[in-house]
Amino acid sequence: MKTQFVVLLVALVLLQMFAQSEAIWGALLSGVADLLGKRGLKNLDDFDDIFDDDLSSADLEFLKQLMR
């Protein structure tokens, strides 16, 4: 009975390790695929424009229309 329990625990640990490593490898492979894709080499960081401190009058008018 003890041997069966130990075999069950070892099997569960190995299965859990396999499941987690598969998720890690999947995430790494999708990241590499994104880098090598058509849009992967472009800088798609849109957060640089958020901190623009100079606003034109057209920008202010657009913001006023949004806040109505």
Swiss-Prot record:
Record PTM Leucine amide, positions in chain: 36
Endpoints of the signal sequence: 1-23
A cellular component annotation (GO) from this entry: extracellular region
Alphabetical keyword list: Amidation, Antimicrobial, Cleavage on pair of basic residues, Secreted, Signal
Top-level lineage group: Eukaryota
Annotated localization: Secreted
Keyword flag Secreted: yes
Proregion span(s): 37-68
Tissue specificity note: Expressed by the venom gland.
Zinc-finger is among the record's keywords: no
Biological function: Probable antimicrobial peptide. Shows low inhibitory activity against herpes simplex virus type 1 (HSV-1).
Family: Belongs to the non-disulfide-bridged peptide (NDBP) superfamily. Short antimicrobial peptide (group 4) family.
Name of this protein: Antimicrobial peptide Eval655
Organism of provenance: Euscorpiops validus
